[in-house]
Amino acid sequence: MYGASGGRAKPERKSGAKEEAGPGGAGGGGSRVELLVFGYACKLFRDDERALAQEQGQHLIPWMGDHKILIDRYDGRGHLHDLSEYDAEYSTWNRDYQLSEEEARIEALCDEERYLALHTDLLEEEARQEEEYKRLSEALAEDGSYNAVGFTYGSDYYDPSEPTEEEEPSKQREKNEAENLEENEEPFVAPLGLSVPSDVELPPTAKMHAIIERTASFVCRQGAQFEIMLKAKQARNSQFDFLRFDHYLNPYYKFIQKAMKEGRYTVLAENKSDEKKKSGVSSDNEDDDDEEDGNYLHPSLFASKKCNRLEELMKPLKVVDPDHPLAALVRKAQADSSTPTPHNADGAPVQPSQVEYTADSTVAAMYYSYYMLPDGTYCLAPPPPGIDVTTYYSTLPAGVTVSNSPGVTTTAPPPPGTTPLPPPTTAETSSGATSTTTTTSALAPVAAIIPPPPDVQPVIDKLAEYVARNGLKFETSVRAKNDQRFEFLQPWHQYNAYYEFKKQFFLQKEGGDSMQAVSAPEEAPTDSAPEKPSDAGEDGAPEDAAEVGARAGSGGKKEASSSKTVPDGKLVKASFAPISFAIKAKENDLLPLEKNRVKLDDDSDDDEESKEGQESSSSAANTNPAVAPPCVVVEEKKPQLTQEELEAKQAKQKLEDRLAAAAREKLAQASKESKEKQLQAERKRKAALFLQTLKNPLPEAEAGKIEESPFSVEESSTTPCPLLTGGRPLPTLEVKPPDRPSSKSKDPPREEEKEKKKKKHKKRSRTRSRSPKYHSSSKSRSRSHSKAKHSLPSAYRTVRRSRSRSRSPRRRAHSPERRREERSVPTAYRVSRSPGASRKRTRSRSPHEKKKKRRSRSRTKSKARSQSVSPSKQAAPRPAAPAAHSAHSASVSPVESRGSSQERSRGVSQEKEAQISSAIVSSVQSKITQDLMAKVRAMLAASKNLQTSAS
């Protein structure tokens, strides 16, 4: 691939060396011819670019300028200037010779064989065909099972003390050969129902017909590929010559195969051999009694006699133990039945099935699940082709009668010593309302069910159970695969009726088991269900809000069939379906469902329970807010579930699983996020402490004030700031003359005491935040502290700035730190110089900041001095005030203008100092402010959106 032209030239040298070495070796060896072979090493170099170019066809050139035909330089067409003579479109045999329909079919089969490996795993197919071939070999064997190995006495275990007896085995062998010869030579007579065309030759013997019949049956089930494999395997076996197209029995084989596919033919070859075996049972028993001398074999070691399973399963049920619980259940149901004589679907009266009692209860239990249908009828095999139905069923054993209805029922006389049960009488229901009468033959007219052979039956039973558990989508997906093993899913298949019967049986069993499991929690009063959605995870009631969502998604038909809701809120019990006669399922079959329920309901964590309850209630509110969780009263007897109910129940189960899984994932994610947030909060708190140690204690005092009112901080961070819109004016700041100086300017010792108290309070809050009890509160405090620090609107920030710049020497010392703190706030939240921006900032005012304003008011010398702002800063709120009807539009007194000019001259020197001191902490603060800026921006945007939507 990567060797390019150098790699191609080497093999040519090698082959040339072989040719040259041949004569040289012959000349030196005399009469003995020697061959000397030598070659050169060829190194391959990986060249990805050239390989890619080769892959994309960049080395190809157009032939004779025609870009439709691209060739490489080694192509022989490069020597030709005209290709029409050699074009396949005109000279191929398929153009000149049109295929007939049969030839086209054979050609299609050949094409399928040619390209089989493209879409089929040949190894798996070969293994499957080997298995089917073994099954066919066993089916073609005539004696009992264990035919693969011949069982002989005396050959391997020679005892010299015993005399050798050659006469008896030889006689027995001759007798068996004579019997086989008689059977093999028995001429074949076509049955009456099999209308063979006149031009089709019949097989000469019954044995040949049996081989053809069984081969056709296997090919119908396994597909044409099995026939090809069988033809290759049995190429030398003359008994399978009918598989060849030119054999005289091939048309008969094709006819039988077509009849089987269309359902017009059932296997009949086994009946005669079974009758012979039955007739020979007595003689076999006599022979066994005679052979009790030397070679005695215990009966338990005998190979089992090969019997017809179809006939065995079709025997009518005539035995039921009177002490069996099912018999008592039948009597009780007939006595308590409120329906008159049941009628079939077409109106013909059906006699209630009564059975003859004997002591063999195991046989009854074994056969119950096979052919006792839910409507009380037995499934009998269809009559052979060409035989009248009435004459066929009239030959059934005594005690089995056939009604005129399509569903075949059987009745037997009551057991001796017992009186027949009286006909059921009508009775009113306890609720007083007339319940809908459910007839025993509620199902559609049931077609006669053909039980499958023992190798197919477990597959059908398993698939029916899986479909009952997983829903009809599973059945459609299996049918879409077109697997030969699951061909019974097709409605035309002979075992489809048996599959449908088993599927309905498992559906009823699944429905009944789940309804029993649901019945206990559903008995809770309906009033408590809507009031306590969070308790659904504790008591494990499936009738919670999650189920409402599932029912709303699947059509909501389940409540209508299981219970009828009266407008006043009471539930009327619906009538239940007839009892299905079947063996009770083992406890192990129900374990997977129980395990799932335990996993869903067994949540010991309170947080998880509340979270699941909230999720289930929210999902119910999203899917169908008007529907309240219904409480369905379930009868003790199992109702017959419809397809919609089963799909709704399965959807509910899947939804519960998904909800539980989502809750667990969310809990794990929340715990992980909470740990990360704790780490982030701890880092931010340490960074804030580091910044506060670098600053003066005045910001610490303010931080203490912020922590004094954590609830107001949380209010400002969680609730939207009330924006004043429209014509609502901002609360005016009254400018009063400096008649009352503040207490802080008169007595500075009191101010120091206050600061000490605040420091103590801050230390106490720090120690409290380290304890696990106050972990979450400290987290919210630290977050709100940082938010409140940086999310002050511009109107309040100007007020705070003006108050901090008083003329006292104490205040003067703190002003650079204040200015540095303000500089660390993002520029988007400082006082803007544009009127539009200032108008936006001056509108939002939180209650927490109003408290701060009141506290800072008490600290200033006078309220008039606190209003003095430098002209550069005062210029922004002044034009914005008329638009917002703010009180900042009050005229500035000469005292204020004088103070502002003095502060401006001071501010130039103080800003230089602040630039030097802020360089130390600017790198740390920039990271924190970037994180907080996004949060504050989102909070302000959300508050504005909420306020505008409310207005």
From Swiss-Prot:
Gene: SFSWAP
Organism: Homo sapiens
GO MF annotations in UniProt: RNA binding
Sites bearing Phosphothreonine, chain numbering: 642
Domain of life: Eukaryota
Annotated PANTHER family: SPLICING FACTOR SUPPRESSOR OF WHITE APRICOT, SPLICING FACTOR, SUPPRESSOR OF WHITE-APRICOT HOMOLOG
Amino acid composition bias (Basic residues), ranges on this chain: 756-790, 798-813, 838-864
Biased composition (Basic and acidic residues): 9-21, 169-178, 592-601, 646-682, 736-755, 814-824, 901-914
Function: Plays a role as an alternative splicing regulator. Regulate its own expression at the level of RNA processing. Also regulates the splicing of fibronectin and CD45 genes. May act, at least in part, by interaction with other R/S-containing splicing factors. Represses the splicing of MAPT/Tau exon 10.
Ranges of the SURP motif repeats in the UniProt entry: 211-253, 459-499
Record's keyword terms, sorted: Acetylation, mRNA processing, mRNA splicing, Nucleus, Phosphoprotein, Repeat, Repressor, RNA-binding, Transcription, Transcription regulation
Protein's recorded name: Splicing factor, suppressor of white-apricot homolog
